[in-house]
């Protein structure tokens, strides 16, 4: 599992790291999970306010490393851009080292049940002869019906707030089912604690965004990846089309709706 972090995201990323740390607590073979962080300290797009501030950020990274024990990479060139798309393209190339590649994101919380669920999926997919697939966890209420298949059962029948008006903006930022609401680890744990049996649906068409995306390594070995021309927005949608191209009529996506 790998995550690209810009230097100005340093104050928010610990929640993500803590969620991965908690997910690791419930598995025995922790040594088989590689947690990687790409720290982008480049000032190509945005300048750090001072050299002193950049030093503080590096110290903070060191503190987080000592606390959570992840593997760090750094990008520090100021004359050449490096983006999340660049990192995820490289992360996908680690497919020969593992069963899955997972796209972390600095503002995404990973569920505690993640690794246990993935072990179950691996066992099931091997039994069924399904080796190339995507897996996604449940998401909150989205803006149109095309996302309904991915929405968590607790949120799918809730209203969507568009933030077009001050009233809708207030509702969007205060309603737990809204994608604009900042859900805490505790709140996510409470939702997931209600699940006793997994609600897993298989879909035969690609539908996902980039946060928390789980990719089987056998799919990546076919060549599915983010095209080199993509370097800013669109890494998830371009990868979606690459998956569609490489799997064709055999596209498979596990949707774990109630986690």
List the predicted regions and their residue ranges.
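A short, conserved alpha-helix in the catalytic core of glycosyltransferases
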Residues: 207-208, 212-213, 218-223, 230-257
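Active-site-proximal specificity loops/subdomain of glycosyltransferases
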Residues: 46-98
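Short beta-strand-to-loop acidic/aromatic patch adjacent to the donor-nucleotide binding site
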Residues: 98-111
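Active-site beta-to-alpha loop of glycosyltransferases that engages the nucleotide-sugar donor
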Residues: 5-18, 43-45, 79-82
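Conserved catalytic core of nucleotide-sugar-dependent glycosyltransferases
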Residues: 92, 111-217, 221
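Short, well-formed alpha-helical segments that are part of the catalytic scaffolds
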Residues: 9-26, 50-53
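Short beta-strand/loop segment that forms part of the nucleotide-sugar
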Residues: 31-47, 76-78
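Active-site acidic Asp-centered loop
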Residues: 42, 104-107, 138
């Amino acid at each position: 599992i790998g995550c690209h972090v810009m230097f100005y995201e340093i104050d928010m990323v610990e929640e993500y790291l803590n969620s991965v740390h908690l997910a690791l607590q419930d598995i025995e073979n922790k040594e088989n999970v590689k947690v990687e962080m790409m720290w982008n300290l480049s000032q190509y797009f945005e300048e750090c306010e001072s050299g002193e501030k950049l030093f503080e950020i590096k110290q903070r990274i060191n503190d987080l490393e000592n606390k959570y024990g992840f593997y760090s990479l750094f990008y520090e060139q100021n004359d050449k851009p490096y983006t999340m798309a660049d990192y995820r393209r490289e992360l996908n190339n680690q497919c020969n080292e593992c069963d899955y590649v997972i796209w972390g994101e600095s503002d995404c919380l990973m569920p505690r049940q993640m690794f246990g669920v993935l072990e179950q999926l691996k066992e099931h997919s091997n039994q069924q002869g399904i080796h190339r697939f995507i897996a996604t966890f449940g998401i909150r209420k989205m803006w149109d019906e095309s996302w309904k298949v991915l929405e968590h059962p607790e949120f799918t029948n809730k209203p969507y707030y568009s933030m077009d008006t001050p009233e809708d903006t207030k509702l969007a930022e205060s309603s737990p089912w809204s994608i604009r609401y900042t859900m805490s680890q505790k709140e996510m744990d409470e939702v997931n604690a209600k699940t006793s049996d997994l609600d897993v649906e298989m879909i035969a068409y690609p539908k996902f965004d980039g946060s928390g995306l789980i990719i089987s390594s056998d799919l990546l070995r076919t060549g599915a990846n983010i095209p080199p021309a993509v370097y800013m927005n669109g890494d998830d949608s371009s990868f979606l089309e690459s998956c569609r191209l490489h799997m064709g009529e055999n596209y498979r996506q596990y949707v774990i709706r109630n986690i």
